[in-house]
């Protein structure tokens, strides 16, 4: 691979042998980087601190990992922190790092980094927000005692929008980086249209605002293209947020299909759609069912089977098990993707947060998208 990469770079600099992060096996394929991706890579070389924005499928995660690869090529002893909020995406990033033997990188979800500082306390009640707040505060106290040699030379944050509303999380990342966010080296990848947390009720502290300012005044770049979705899905995703459709890979697929969400018949409609439509075209392993509702409030909550398949929660660390159908929530599945997606429990698009959840859920589909939505909803923003 190394020799092929050198040949490709010599013949055509914009060609690069890059790990395809969409593949379960991290297949290596020769791809042409888009103009915006090349621009980002050039800016990474020119700036100590860079904020990169881009919509779903624009390659933010791909570029975050490529940033780490290039750093290690130039500085093999560099200590890198690769962080995201989402547990599933964090497990995926950690797996990529292990498989590529990039031992200088500490990759994973934010709370896995907390575990690295103060130890893993095992399974906890995920709804207990006070527990997680305390974990961050304990990790922050430990991090403040680290020597410079124990801190990161480079911090790479994926899905950075998930951290903006939490000053203590930002402070922990600030402390973990040599020179902090003000003088250290960092790359911050985000999409502000994917902020799913409720509007904060309290004003940010002065320290919180100062850390946000450091992100917002840094050099910035934009990833313009959508490489994940078909034209049909990209059109639907753009419509729900009132956004212009970004240039895509010009892959055309089936039209986005919508079924009615009827009160007290939500599960029956999901089962009918899956058994009579989706499973006729796609294998269960290629399908993910996402709910707009939180854990325990999904239309399939409390059910064991669906269309003759055993319902299991999606877990990227586990291989698909025959005879099952995988389910998750929009919030948990952020940063991930699937060949076919059924997005259900779409009962409201009245708030910006509702639309953002639909935007995130819909954009997880690479080729086929099915929606189960309350009739009469306005899909066009504004």
Q: What role is predicted for each listed range?
A:
Residues 1-4, 129-133, 204, 263:
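Intrinsic-disorder-associated interaction segments
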Residues 121-141:
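Short glycine-rich substrate-engagement loop in P-loop NTPases that contacts/grips substrate
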Residues 30, 34-122, 142, 149-382:
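Conserved helicase motor core of SF1/SF2 NTP-dependent helicases
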Residues 1-47:
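ATP-dependent helicase/translocase motor core
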């Amino acid at each position: 691979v190394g020799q092929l990469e050198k040949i490709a770079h010599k013949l055509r600099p914009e060609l690069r042998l890059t790990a395809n992060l969409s593949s379960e096996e991290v297949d290596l394929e020769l791809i042409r980087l888009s103009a915006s991706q090349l621009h980002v890579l050039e800016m990474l070389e020119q700036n100590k601190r860079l904020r990169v924005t881009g919509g779903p499928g624009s390659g933010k995660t791909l570029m975050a990992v490529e940033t780490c690869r290039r750093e290690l090529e130039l500085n093999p002893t560099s200590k890198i922190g690769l962080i995201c909020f989402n547990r599933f995406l964090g497990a995926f990033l950690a797996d990529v790092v292990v498989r590529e033997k990039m031992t200088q990188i500490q990759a994973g979800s934010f709370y896995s980094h907390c575990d690295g500082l103060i130890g893993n306390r095992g399974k906890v009640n995920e709804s207990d927000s006070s527990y997680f707040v305390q974990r961050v505060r304990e990790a922050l106290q430990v991090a403040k005692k680290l020597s410079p040699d124990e801190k990161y030379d480079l911090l790479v944050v994926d899905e950075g929008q998930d951290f903006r509303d939490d000053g203590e999380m930002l402070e922990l990342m600030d402390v973990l980086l040599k020179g902090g966010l003000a003088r250290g080296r960092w790359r911050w990848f985000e999409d502000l249209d994917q902020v799913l947390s409720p509007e904060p009720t309290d004003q940010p502290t002065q320290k919180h605002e100062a850390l946000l300012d450091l992100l917002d005044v840094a050099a910035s770049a934009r990833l313009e293209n959508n490489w994940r979705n078909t034209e049909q899905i990209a059109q639907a995703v753009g419509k729900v947020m009132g956004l212009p459709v970004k240039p895509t890979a010009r892959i055309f697929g089936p039209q986005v299909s919508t079924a009615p969400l009827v009160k007290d018949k939500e599960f029956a409609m999901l089962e009918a759609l899956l058994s009579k439509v989706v499973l006729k075209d796609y294998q269960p392993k290629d399908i993910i069912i996402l709910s707009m509702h939180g854990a325990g409030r999904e239309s399939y909550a409390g059910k064991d089977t669906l269309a003759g398949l055993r319902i299991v929660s999606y877990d990227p660390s586990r291989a698909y098990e025959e005879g099952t159908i995988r389910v998750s929530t929009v919030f948990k599945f952020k940063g991930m993707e699937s060949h076919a997606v059924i997005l259900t429990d779409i009962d409201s698009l009245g708030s910006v947060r509702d639309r953002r959840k639909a935007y995130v859920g819909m954009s997880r589909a690479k080729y086929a998208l099915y929606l189960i939505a309350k009739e009469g909803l306005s899909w066009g923003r504004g």
